[in-house]
């Protein structure tokens, strides 16, 4: 079931993210790939910046994690990962819907690699729309703390909805 993750789940978050992120290897620009994909210090910084993780646990193992972050007047969906063995079984959808229920803003954004069509399609399936390149650049620089090279090679999707 879905639950809010705590410091006790830190290693589990890292395990899911780094296990699933292997799919990016050879697809995202090689200068952006690193192993582990998300080092522990980077995850600490994400949590300190306000990303709250939620996870799905089955048989005492986390199979999916996803983060949510409110920044000023928008909500960001961050670090959405489902173990490969559990993909296309509704876990990502259920986590996303749970986070959208928590979001209190009228605009929700998700960023991902341009070279990850599976991730783009996932968000589009749930009503998100790709923003223009100019808007993407502005949004990534305003709401995310990522290198310029990642800005160049990413996309942003937006979900407009009624504020809570």
Identify the residue ranges that each predicted region occupies.
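A short helix-loop-beta-strand connector motif used in the catalytic cores of GNAT acetyltransferases and
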Residues: 41-54, 150-153
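Conserved GNAT-fold acetyl-CoA-binding loop/helix
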Residues: 18-43
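Active-site acidic-Proline motif in GNAT/NAT acetyltransferases
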Residues: 70, 83-85, 89, 115
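A short beta-loop-alpha structural element at the N-terminal edge
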Residues: 1-15
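Conserved acetyl-CoA-binding loop-helix of GNAT-fold acetyltransferases
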Residues: 82, 88-101, 125
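Conserved beta-strand-loop-alpha-helix junction that forms the acyl-donor binding cleft
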Residues: 110-120, 136-141
């Amino acid at each position: 079931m879905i639950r809010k993750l705590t410091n006790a789940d830190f290693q589990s978050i890292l395990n899911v993210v780094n296990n699933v992120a292997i799919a990016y290897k050879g697809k995202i620009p090689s200068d952006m790939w690193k192993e582990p994909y998300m080092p522990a210090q980077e995850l600490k910084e994400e949590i300190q910046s306000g990303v709250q993780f939620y996870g799905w646990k089955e048989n005492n193992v986390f199979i999916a994690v996803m983060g949510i972050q409110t920044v000023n007047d928008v909500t960001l969906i961050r670090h959405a990962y489902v173990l490969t063995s559990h993909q296309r079984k509704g876990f990502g959808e259920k986590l996303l819907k749970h986070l959208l229920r928590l979001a209190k803003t009228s605009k929700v954004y998700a960023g991902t690699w341009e070279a990850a069509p599976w991730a783009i399609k996932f968000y589009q399936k749930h009503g998100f729309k790709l923003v223009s390149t100019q808007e993407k650049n502005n949004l990534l620089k305003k709401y995310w703390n990522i290198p310029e090279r990642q800005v160049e090679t990413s996309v942003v999707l937006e979900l407009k909805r009624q504020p809570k």
